[in-house]
């Protein structure tokens, strides 16, 4: 790890740091009650991955080079933001918000920023608000299709219960939509899904 004694999770195959790795690591940490690990990963992610201004404000760069200490791409992968918000809501409920990090405040910052993203700078909400499904990426054409592995109906239920941002019913609708979508997107015999899919569940080619 580099920077303020914080840590990151490195992607071994591609030799980079990705939001899916750090946000998944935070989920494991909060589930195992490893507050110090959680806090260190979050602080690192906030410093090096999170955009602090502009159209991408509060979103995260999905890939980071730990050698050059620069972002490989400023763009976001929607599952990273999905996990970060859920991680922080879990942490808020487990440890409170008076122990050094206001977890709830950090979660709300991301959520509130999502709802302000209307396509300015080609950046959108991570959830396609028309289809009530998570997008592949909240940018450009990537907003118009999805990755089945990103669909986490239980996470949407958590947002509806604990985010308290006024969008509770929308999140519950997203949870219901995700459950229906996964039945469509997964092969009935193998229960496997394609890497990418259209919102009605058929494969999307890239």
Residue ranges and their predicted role:
Residues 15-19, 54-57, 75-79, 101-206:
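Extended ligand-binding clefts on enzyme/binding-domain cores
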Residues 67-74, 88-97, 135-140:
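Short acidic, glycine/Ser/Thr-rich loop/turn "cap" segments at secondary-structure junctions
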Residues 11-15, 26-31, 71-74, 96-99, ...:
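Second-shell loop/turn segments in exported
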Residues 40-47, 72, 89-90, 105-115:
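Active-site-adjacent structural elements in enzyme catalytic domains
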Residues 3-8:
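Short, small-residue-biased leader/transition segments that mark boundaries at the very start
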Residues 21-37, 44-47, 82-98, 151-167:
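Well-ordered alpha-helical scaffold segments within catalytic/enzyme domains
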Residues 35-76:
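Helix-terminus loop motifs that line ligand-binding clefts
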Residues 9-10, 134:
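Generic recognition of long tandem-repeat/solenoid scaffolds
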């Amino acid at each position: 790890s580099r920077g303020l004694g914080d840590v990151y999770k490195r992607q071994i195959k591609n030799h980079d740091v990705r939001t899916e790795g750090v946000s998944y690591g935070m989920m494991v940490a909060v589930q195992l009650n490893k507050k110090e690990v959680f806090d260190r990963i979050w602080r690192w992610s906030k410093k090096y991955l999170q955009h602090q201004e502009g159209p991408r404000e509060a979103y995260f760069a999905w890939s980071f080079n730990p050698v050059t200490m620069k972002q490989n791409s400023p763009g976001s992968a929607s599952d990273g933001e999905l996990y970060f918000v859920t991680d922080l809501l879990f942490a808020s409920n487990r440890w409170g918000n008076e122990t050094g990090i206001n977890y709830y405040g950090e979660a709300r910052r991301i959520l509130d920023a999502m709802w302000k993203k209307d396509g300015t700078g080609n950046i959108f909400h991570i959830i396609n608000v028309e289809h009530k499904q998570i997008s592949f990426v909240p940018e450009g054409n990537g907003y118009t299709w999805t990755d089945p592995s990103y669909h986490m109906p239980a996470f949407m239920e958590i947002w509806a219960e604990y985010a308290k941002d006024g969008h509770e019913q929308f999140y519950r609708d997203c949870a219901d939509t995700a459950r229906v979508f996964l039945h469509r997107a997964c092969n009935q015999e193998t229960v496997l899904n394609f890497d990418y899919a259209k919102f009605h569940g058929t494969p999307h080619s890239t």
